[in-house]
Amino acid sequence: MKNIGVRIRGIYATALTKYLVDKGYRICHVSGKIASRLKIPQDQSSPDVDVKHNFDRQGISVVGAEESLSRLIDDLRGDFIDIVTIPSRVELYGLYKGKNFRGKVDLGGVYGFMEDEGGGEVELLVQVAEIKNVPLLSRNITFSGDYVILIPQGGIKISKNIKDRRDRTHLFELGRKLSVPNNYGVLWRTASMTAPDDLLRQEVEKLSGELKDLFERYKGSSVGMLRPGKRHVSIIFGSDTKKKLDFIRNNLIPTSTNHHKLKSGGKDIALALAVYEEILRKHHIVDDFEGMIRGLLGPKERNLIRIEHVKLDGRVINLGEARIAYFSHPDMTLERKVYGNGVYDGLDVQKDNGDKIVTEVQEKSWYIVHKYYSPQGRYKGSYYNICTPVEFYPTKIRYIDLEIDVVKTDRVKIIDREALGQRVADKLISERLAEKAVAKAEELAEELS
């Protein structure tokens, strides 16, 4: 038994809760619906790790203390092959002295962003309020403990998860008796509901002292972190991981094929899917929700579609729009025109204005191929991009680039093998995923030779 408490929210909650329960984790603040499905007890203690879906729904953000977070990530990487783990270089909710210039704030070699308040380059105290690929900063400084948060406005607030009127009244009265720094108030967290009053008083006193000390230290400090927050790691899910989570969820409740992929496609599709699965739960019908979405929204031949190329460091590279020349699920052919001159990276052949790129892709394939032609139709070469299984959405195709590639011109060669090895050393991907990518590259190279 790990005795690590995890709070899970978002579109992956049901499947991840089941997975983590089976791995021996303790689930905190579980929703009533999921508690009923899994028959797990309510636990209102403070979680060691917080999990919620990323802002783009293509994975999860995990936040917590180093040891608990590392154990959770090790379990996920051991059981799901195509995940990428990207640690943030700043700590979520951490307090920093920064140097602001037009909304871009130097936190000590790492940059965060906030609304530009003008006035040129100035030093200020900021907090990492959110991380969406980049740190988003706020000047509204909060101080968090296990049971209470000191908030930069007066008054007493209580977590909406504390429902009992007697508990709320008791916490409100307790808050009125406590002394906090000027212009600050108290927000009681859910875990305060079951904690003894003495412990709550001690935490408020401790946080108040730390807050006063921080404002004093800030004046003479250099740019950098003044108070730690929580470690933040973004975990990107590939297609295989979503399919495995579908399987876990389907063993609990009726789940449409490609449920988590569809959920990650946007709120409108997610809402329609919820209605569809309610019907699926009550009636015996053929499950083809994704086919209906394709028929209504695409992709469709002659339409434009985006190519979303996700790097292992989390950057999303938009390769531009391509025309769908052919589509019969799961096969698709795209065409793009080249503007500008130069040299094609990897192929080392001339790039000319007016060249045509023909991209052939199959959903769930571990590679995507780009074929290059001159304006007159002369073949120049092919670039086989090894990636996580490709996903089709109505307006885009998506995959995670696995660094290693195969190129074919007058000869066939594998490139960037060393770059993939470095990603394993950096712990962005597992050894197992790297081995899968290398095996696919070697298989393709042999077929093409």
Regions found by a protein language model. Give the residues of each.
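Charge-rich, low-complexity N-terminal segments
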Residues: L262-Y344
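Short acidic-glycine loop/turn motifs at beta-strand connectors
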Residues: P152-G154, F327-P330, S374-G377, K408-R411
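Phosphate/ribose-recognition catalytic cores of enzymes acting on nucleotide-derived substrates
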Residues: G346-T395
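OB-fold (S1/OB) nucleic-acid-binding surfaces
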Residues: F101-M114, D331
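Short, surface-exposed coil-to-beta transition loops
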Residues: I317-E321, N353-G354, S365-V369, Y399-E403
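A hydrophobic, small-residue-rich beta->alpha segment in the mid-to-C-terminal subdomain
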Residues: R398-E447
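OB-fold/S1-family RNA-binding modules
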Residues: K2-G94, G98-N100, E115-H283
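Short, compositionally biased leader-like segments
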Residues: V275-L296, V361-S382, E443
